[in-house]
Amino acid sequence: MSGVNEIRSTFLNYFAKNGHEIVSSSPLVPRNDPTLMFTNAGMVQFKNVFTGLEKRSYQRATTSQKCVRAGGKHNDLDNVGYTARHLTFFEMLGNFSFGDYFKERAIELAWNLITRDFGLKKDKLLVTVYHTDDEAAGYWKKIAGFSDDRIIRIPTSDNFWAMGDTGPCGPCSEIFIDRGEHIFGGPPGSPDEDGDRFLEFWNLVFMQYDQVTKDERVPLPRPSIDTGMGLERMASILQGVDSVFDTDLFRSLIDATSSALGRGPTEQDAASFRVIADHLRSSSFLIADGVLPSNEGRGYVLRRIMRRAMRHAQLLGASEPLMWRLVWALVREMGQAYPELVRAEAMIEETMRLEETRFRKTLDRGLAILDEKSAGLKKGDMFDGETAFTLYDTYGFPLDLTQDALRNRGINVDIASFTDAMDRQRAKARASWAGSGEAATEAVWFSLREKLGATEFLGYDTETAEGVVTALVKDGAEVDALKAGESGAIIVNQTPFYAESGGQVGDTGVLTADGVRFVVTDTMKKAGDLFVHFGTVEQGSIKLGDALALDVDHARRSAIRANHSATHLLHEALRQVLGDHIAQKGSLVAPDRLRFDFVHQKPITQDELRKVEDIANDIVLENDEVVTRLMAVDDAREAGARALFGEKYGDEVRVVSMGKAARDHGSNVFGWSVELCGGTHVKRTGDIGLVSITGESAVAAGVRRIEALTGRAARHNANAAISTAKLAASELRTTLDDMPARITALMDERKKLERELSEARKKLAMGGSAAGDGAASDVRDIGGIKLMARAVEGIEIKDLKGLVDQGKKQLGSGVIALVATSEDGKGSIVVGVTPDLVSRFSAVDLVRKASEVLGGKGGGGKPDMAQAGGPDGSKAGAALEAIAAAIGG
């Protein structure tokens, strides 16, 4: 029972048998805490439960939570690969009590699991407690039979946990194992506690206080439990190895890397194999949860992780992209526990392959610069932080990659100067994930949710209903009434108004009663499932307890339904045309348009867009029934229902099926398009009317966007396009069918005329005749040196060099200078010197003289041919005279 997968199952099943609900891991991108970059602990998804802002149907829970610590406050990136225990991605096993059992039961459950189920020996174990927590110490004596020397009292914050400056907090107790004298280190609290001999593997947090202010702490009415055990650490203990990288999971990933490289690790490069194995996990899980590499926020952290792994692959001799070729091994090991890996496998591979391909183009160049700039440094020296920033900013080298490359030489990077140069980018990155400061405003909604419960949504079946006002909010505070002319928010016990979510905008409409009219301008979800109607009282006054008639804007809702259903059709059509890697990244479903963002690494061609549009419209024309079914989430996924990456779903979900295959098959739903979706949809695909794609663009690296219209809007757009095409055909004196050929012929004719005009201008520039005899009349003799100098018109800079070469041949011996003025008044000049004179005159020197007159700075080229420019083309004549003066001087 020592394999990672078996350890995970044993832990979860043990707590399930002891009355705990097994709760799926939440995504790595926190849904309820914008101040966190990544989920880094098991309690994150339960934060609002602990604070009392959210209620769950259970009081005990157990999870295996995927976590990342590679950015922000918790950052283990630099240590990964070089220590026995640091990881960027890890699984935290945990059990939680929300006001149910407390210290004694928590300690008893932990002790029985590790000694009975996991078989750990008592004489190898010891624990820490907060120095004043006599209660916990007493329970350890009672339950485990520990003597005082096995219960170490710690007076620091290491054994007192707090959620923040205020809120739930309490002492904690950590469980350690002594791994033997062959490993350096001392017990916790000793001078050598940072060694690896005594390994902490489980932390039991006893939430028993509420930190009201800095100086005031009061007991919580319902104390809670939050525990966290590192799965990888426990695996190393049970498998009898000293490093997490020697456990079965990591050995399989390292073996896959060895197979791909054609060689195994050596003592010198073992760290690189470990880095690749760890970073493969964190990168893959982040991509599966919807994070893509970019230059800011979470995407930047992902890029740092990926590029660090790619750098180590390069150190191991990989000549081609490596990481994407290892994804299958990770899916094999962890796909059963985390099915999102299986669903996202193709997307992970494609994202990694393209990122590594991009990075390899600049890696060699950046490393060459790094080697050049650090060539004079020796062990103990400091590498300039400004240069490190240039490597990041210009070549995409994250700081940690630069540090990693210099680590083996014993050279450090000047972090202070790097940070100074990086401040703006860091601020921008933080802005993409830091909280917006709305927590105080949001508190009113959580308070109301606690008091009122969830709003009953009726909008799947009706657009009209009656409801009773249960709360009124104005300027972020509860009020007893809203008067005519006042804007605010109304909550009713039940509503047909759809609240904005899943990309679908909120409904608008009116709430009315005798002499009362409230115009709803938006409907939003607050505190999870509290439907809030925002708007203005146009007539009368609305008070708590009033009964209102609720009427959704029917025409607007109908248009939204069509656009939402069309989004599903386009999603499936994109997968058919472009591949299974297509995954939704976001959407907007509005009454007048829709847009759909998805993972794809290159622009979509017009032919591909046409195919996508045709496939979607074929389903529309079939006019099949749209089937909606409530299902268990696992059954829905088994039926092939597509889910939004990174989204957290409840135990029961709505499944929307479209297309000929949509039919009843007992507990499963099959269809041409099958998605988990809480939005509103048409009854039949024919109700969409028509789908018209109006645009395609890039949103971010690896993310594309299509925009489309449906129904009347699509028809109007198509009619407008046809009218424009007919008008164009009329102007071209052709038919619609023949217009493409007519346009091609006209474009060919235009190119021909442009070429002829260009040749004519060149001849005119060189004297006006094909023989070029007119040019000879412009030649001056300056001290025995022939100078051909002209200001020409209508000549592009790219043609000037050819004309100068032609002039040099005509002169035989001499200097030729041509100045052309562009439409915006800028001047360009090219100077040529025949081979026999380059020892006396440099074209570069002469062209710089002319450039100064034109208001330019310098110029460049070779002694026989050089060019320059300046903003003032009106001084072309004076520029030529400057060249003449230089020759005569």
Swiss-Prot record:
It comes from the Bacteria. GO terms for molecular function: alanine-tRNA ligase activity; aminoacyl-tRNA deacylase activity; ATP binding; tRNA binding; zinc ion binding. SUPFAM superfamilies: Class II aaRS and biotin synthetases (SSF55681), Putative anticodon-binding domain of alanyl-tRNA synthetase (AlaRS) (SSF101353), ThrRS/AlaRS common domain (SSF55186), Translation proteins (SSF50447). PROSITE patterns: AA_TRNA_LIGASE_II_ALA (PS50860). One of its GO terms (biological process) is alanyl-tRNA aminoacylation. Its EC number is 6.1.1.7. Keywords: Aminoacyl-tRNA synthetase, ATP-binding, Cytoplasm, Ligase, Metal-binding, Nucleotide-binding, Protein biosynthesis, RNA-binding, tRNA-binding, Zinc. CDD domains: AlaRS_core (cd00673). Zn(2+) binds at H564, H568, C677, H681. Binds 1 zinc ion per subunit. It catalyses: tRNA(Ala) + L-alanine + ATP = L-alanyl-tRNA(Ala) + AMP + diphosphate. GO terms for cellular component: cytosol. Its cofactor is Zn(2+). It is found in: Cytoplasm. Coiled coil: none annotated. NCBIfam families: alaS. Belongs to the class-II aminoacyl-tRNA synthetase family. Catalyzes the attachment of alanine to tRNA(Ala) in a two-step reaction: alanine is first activated by ATP to form Ala-AMP and then transferred to the acceptor end of tRNA(Ala). Also edits incorrectly charged Ser-tRNA(Ala) and Gly-tRNA(Ala) via its editing domain. Consists of three domains; the N-terminal catalytic domain, the editing domain and the C-terminal C-Ala domain. The editing domain removes incorrectly charged amino acids, while the C-Ala domain, along with tRNA(Ala), serves as a bridge to cooperatively bring together the editing and aminoacylation centers thus stimulating deacylation of misacylated tRNAs. This is Alanine--tRNA ligase.
